[in-house]
């Protein structure tokens, strides 16, 4: 048996088991419509499901809001207060010093582009950007475009260097990364969790390498800046931005219960103050600061909020954080959702550690069960403690896209393709993989149903659509319906 498919030992300790018994997943699932749709929702790395409360809030806000920073009416001022409070909540939840560290964007991709355009004029001929082969396209393509398409037009040659990862373990090759960073490395880009391999690079070690580069930044610092892609890390872990020590951290709320259209760039305030904004126009300029011969920027964070923002999306996104606290904290805690209660960082740590523990247990179960599927190759670390809550794999003789389609026919949500992680797939010599991914509303029964369906498809052929009951050794829950129809419309 290859290392890619060898069985693993469960990581559940007695303490973890007691914690899981206290985790009220059935109560949590009662907040979501998908549980009534007869589907196994295991494509959460792409997007999570929105709970009732956020959908209701969004509908309510649509009927009563006005624009922000653009009116003296009671409705406008009320909406402005809620909108600005959302920035405070986001900063508090992530351990950022203040709202001045927060840039609200559409998604993680836009966050990376915002960094790229903000720093673009600072690059000098002969500089380089160091990234890794673990990156999502959103943290590779902008830098490729900068180095190969944009800066050469201005006579500046900037190299893009990529650090390898170990193909067996999926771990980032820190020695190779260190060899690429030098005194001309302006920026180091690294994911906090791969959306394909699940790998969680040691950001503290990456930060130390960036800090030691001796690159002369325009603000007088001698180090490389560090951009961390947190799209797959922030939704399932306790985040302390100040402790992380990164200059930039990105993520999207659609992977964290909120509807689509809101992402966040958390950034070093000094860099936001000294860098140029990504977009220009209304509200990002100061009152009375626009003249024919000069323009003055607004104070942070509004310097990076040009034009009418996604007001409703931003308010709902911040409330998603509050709702996560209510769902993840133990019963009896005062509620955060729809309240003015100041977010307590201790509560954030307790809640997100519980989320991480539960996701880890589901991932360990999936890894262990996948080891028994004939011909299956699992990619990335075998230890659930060293990876995010997803599993990507291939099965000999089966096209991954056809596997995902067959899983869909069996009522299981999956994703196949390169997951926008083309570099990592090419490094392993494959074009695509099939992926299952979990969030804190999933259950051990969900894992069993997904992998039982996969095993049936592999054994019977890719057109199989019947999901057998989970074996008693892996689940004590009732078996699912024999056939779960493919999603046909709204889940509401």
What do the predicted segments below correspond to?
Residues 2-476, 480-492:
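Pyridoxal 5′-phosphate
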């Amino acid at each position: 048996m290859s290392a890619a498919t060898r069985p693993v030992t469960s990581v559940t300790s007695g303490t973890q088991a007691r914690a899981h018994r206290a985790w009220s997943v059935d109560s949590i699932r009662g907040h979501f419509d998908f549980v009534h749709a007869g589907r196994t929702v295991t494509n959460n790395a792409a997007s999570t499901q929105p709970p009732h409360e956020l959908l209701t809030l969004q509908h309510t806000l649509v009927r009563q809001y006005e624009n922000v920073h653009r009116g003296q009416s009671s409705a406008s001022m009320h909406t402005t207060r809620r909108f600005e409070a959302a920035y405070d909540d986001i900063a508090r939840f992530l351990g950022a010093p203040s709202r001045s560290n927060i840039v609200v964007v559409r998604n993680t991709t836009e966050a990376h582009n915002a960094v790229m355009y903000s720093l673009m004029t600072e690059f000098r001929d002969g500089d380089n950007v160091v990234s890794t082969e673990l990156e999502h396209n959103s943290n590779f393509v902008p830098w490729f475009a900068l180095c190969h398409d944009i800066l050469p037009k201005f006579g500046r040659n900037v190299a893009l260097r990529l650090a390898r990862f170990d193909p067996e373990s999926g771990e980032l090759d820190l020695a190779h990364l260190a060899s690429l960073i030098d005194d001309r490395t302006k920026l180091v880009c690294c994911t906090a969790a791969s959306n394909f391999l699940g790998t969680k690079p040691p950001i503290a070690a990456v930060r130390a390498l960036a800090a030691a580069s001796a690159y002369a930044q325009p603000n007088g610092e001698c180090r490389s800046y560090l951009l961390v892609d947190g799209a797959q890390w922030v939704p399932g872990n306790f985040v302390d931005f100040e402790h992380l020590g990164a200059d930039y951290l990105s993520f999207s709320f659609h992977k964290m219960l909120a509807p689509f259209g809101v992402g966040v760039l958390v950034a070093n305030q000094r860099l936001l103050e000294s860098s140029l904004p990504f977009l220009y126009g209304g509200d990002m300029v100061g009152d009375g600061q626009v003249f024919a011969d000069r323009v003055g920027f607004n104070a942070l964070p509004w310097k990076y909020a040009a034009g009418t923002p996604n007001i409703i999306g931003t308010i709902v996104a911040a409330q998603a954080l509050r709702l996560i606290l209510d769902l993840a904290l133990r019963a009896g805690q005062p509620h955060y959702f729809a309240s003015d209660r100041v977010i307590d960082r201790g509560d954030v740590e307790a809640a997100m550690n519980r989320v991480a523990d539960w996701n880890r247990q589901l991932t360990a179960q999936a890894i262990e069960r996948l080891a028994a599927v004939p011909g299956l190759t699992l990619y990335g670390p075998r230890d659930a403690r060293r990876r995010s809550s997803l599993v990507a794999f291939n099965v000999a003789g089966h096209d991954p896209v056809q596997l995902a389609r067959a899983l869909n026919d069996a009522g299981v949500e999956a994703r196949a393709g390169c997951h926008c992680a083309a570099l990592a797939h090419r490094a392993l010599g494959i074009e695509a993989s099939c992926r299952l991914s979990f969030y804190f509303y999933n259950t051990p029964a969900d894992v069993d149903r997904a992998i039982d369906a996969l095993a049936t498809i592999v054994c019977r052929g890719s057109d199989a659509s019947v999901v057998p009951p989970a074996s008693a050794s892996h689940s004590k829950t009732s078996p699912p319906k024999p056939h779960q129809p493919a999603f046909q419309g709204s889940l509401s």
